Every structure is written in structure tokens, then in C-alpha cells.
Amino acid sequence: MPIQEVRCSLCRRKIKVHDQYDIPIFDPNTGFAICKNCIREVNRFLDEHDQIKGQAVETQQQHKHGFASQLSKVLKKNKPHVIKEYLDEFIIKQERAKKILSVAAYNHYKRMLYDYEHDSGEDELDKSNVIIMGPTGCGKTALLSHLSRLLDIPFAVTDASSLTEAGFVGADVEVAVRNLYYAAGKDIEKTEHGIIYLDEFDKIARKSGENNSITADPGHEGVQQGLLKMLEGSVVEFTARGQRKHPEAPTIKVNTRNILFIVGGAFVGIEKIVARRVKKSASSMGFGAEIQSNEDESKRYDELIHQVRPEDLMKYGIIPEIIGRLPVICTLETLDEDSLLRILTEPKNAPVKQYEKLLAMDNVKLEFAEDALRAVAKKAIERKTGARSLKGIIEDTMLDVMFDIPKTDEPRKVVITAACINDGETPKIEPLDAKGLLELKQLNVNKPNDDDDPDDEENTPA
């Protein structure tokens, strides 16, 4: 090669070329050339890139191993019987439901561990999402809230009746994942291992089914279709809260493969579908006949709700594809008067215990007469809202007392009787004796300073 000057196409320097080693890449037809210095820099960059890529893969593998180790610890610590024992501390009755959810959560964690320890392939384990049904105020949301608290995973509730088919005004199905994302503190990894509860799921049943609810709408089948891939496991894209959805908006991506979906609702009327399936006439089961008492009606409901099968859900208006992605059916019983009475006082976060602590902070001992507790339970049954209304009934009764007692620090006792609940009689405020003072101290509640923020309350059974 004769001596000539060539300009490097990358660094734009002129190079005197004696032979091919001075300019390793050169096309005389186009004049394209790369000098040896630029080639050296490119090779160095590629070596560094490979090294960084290798480190990233190694870090990812270490992270994957660390998460698998964390899952293993959770499984060893939270066997199904341990999960149920924890739920027993907060939830009265619902023994079968607590067992079903304990096993479902345990198996879900085992499935995730299996996926981390084995590369995804033909032998991967399918996800077992849950459908939970029972009357209003029987403990559906409370069960799931305490379950997520024990497992220390994010939990979010979304009202399924607010979801709309794509193209209609309302919330898209992706909002359920977005709610979980914010419940997880905007941590995508935590989001991808959380629990989503779709409440009021029965409200999106097809009206063409045997369910004739006026809240059902033919368009709700589109909502069910929109949930299919999300339930099975897919990458869901959504915009941040407050941002309008448009093509240029930045999106957040979450893989729902390891999110446990639980859908629930009252499914009003499904017991009649079950009754027809088991070939018992409406009259023999009491439907359409005169109801003798609320207790008889509840017993009939509980008897039938535990026999719900996938075909009953199809007749109710849930599409077959959705039912196939909800293999676990969990049913809850109606809470009778005795159960509501226990809920008032027995769980760790019982409403009465909460109010005892609140009043103790004002140097006041709270006492409920037995007939007062019974009156609260009876009123909740009359309202047909289950345990959900217990705290509200007590709040209404004690409003004036809680307004007046902070006026003085003198130790006192507040006594709630049945007349306070039923007739609106003002609760009695009495001096506190030595025994009462001792019991007040045993509550171990410190009076807050004016600048202190009140502690958050536990969730009441719902």
C-alpha cells in the first residue's frame, strides 16, 4: 500500500498510512476507515460492557437466590396450622375459611419457591387464585388483611364494581395492580409478590345468567374478560396516580404471575341456584315460603353456600374462563348473635378492647354490662351488616361521653347498659374505687401529651 493520508471515520483524525496495520479497516471505494486507536477503544468498551453484564447477571442470580432463601424462611415459619392459629386471634368462627386461606397462602409461597429454584418450563406449578363468598360483615376483608400482615406482604383492596371495560368511563382493570403498587410503597418487586382482593366481584356478573340482580350489567362481561390475563399472570402497564393515560405518558410495568388474586362478594341469590341443583324445591328449602326467623334463614343460607360448585357460579353470571382461574372456592358463614357477642370482646382487636384503651388514656375505666353487649349484637343483626356495624353502634352510644370526659383528669368509671344501646340513655359516670384504679393501671396505657399523635387502631372484624 503506497503512503497516503486517510481520515478516520470515528475520530476524524488524518493518518499517514504505510500499510494495513496503520488503518486496519479501510474501504477505498467509500473512503470509510477506522484507525487502530479507535479499534482499541471500541474493544476496551466491549470488554467493559461484557464485564458489567456479567456482574449484573451475577447480582441478579444472587438476588434470586436471596429471595428464594427468604421464601424458604417464610414457609418454615408459617405452616398452615400456624397461619390459622394467628387468624384465630382476630377472627371469630369461620373455621373452614381460615383453613382454606391458610393452605392457599402456604401453597402459593411453595409455588413461588419452586419457580425460583427451577427454571420456568413445562413442569411449572399453576397459580391457585381464590374466590371467597359470604354475607356482608362476615369477615372476608378482615381475614385477608390479617393474613397479609402475618406474611408481611403488601395487600390492596379494589372494588370490582367500579371497574369498567376498556373504552368506557370509569376505572380500568389495571387499577387493581396500581393500588397494590402504592400499598407496596412503589416497590415493584414487593408488588409482584403481594395479594390483591377484588371486592364486590359478584357485581360484575353477567345479567344473562340466572342472577337477576339489578346491579348486574351486560357490559360487565367485558370487565371479566379484561381480568383474565391478569389473574393468570401477565405484564400489566399503568400510569402513576394523577397522570392522564395517553400514548406519551410514562408507564409502570408489573408482572402479575406471582400475585395472589382473591375475589369475593356476597353473591346474593346463589344459594337459590344451589338449591335447584341439589334438587330441593324452593318451598321445601324455605325459599319463597314464610321465613320463621332470621336464625332459620341464616342456617338455610349456610347449609347451601358451602355446597357452591363452579357450575353454580357459571349460572350466576361468572364466565367459565374466570372460574377456571379461580380453582379455590372459600365460603363464609353468617354471623349469629352469639358470634357477634364474641367478636365484641374476644379478638385481640375487639371493639370493646379498643374503647377500653382509648378511655384509659383519659383516666377512665369502661365497663359494658352483659345485656349491653347483647343489645349491640342484636342491633347489628337488625341492620343486616354483620360485624361491620358493631363499632359504629358503640360509637353512637358513647359520643357524648367521649366528648365530656377529657374535661377533667379525675379517675372515673363509665358504665354502658342495655338502655344506653336501645333507648339512647346517657351512660353512667361513677367514681372509681381502689379495685378499679388497679384494673385501670393494668391496661398499661400511658396518657399522651398534647403534641403526641394517636396510635392507629387495629382493623375491626368486618
Annotate each PLM feature.
Residues 12, 36-39:
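Cys/His-coordinated zinc-binding microdomains
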Residues 2-28, 45, 49-93, 98-156, ...:
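AAA+ P-loop NTPase nucleotide-binding core of proteostasis motors
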Residues 38, 42-46:
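Short, structured interface segments
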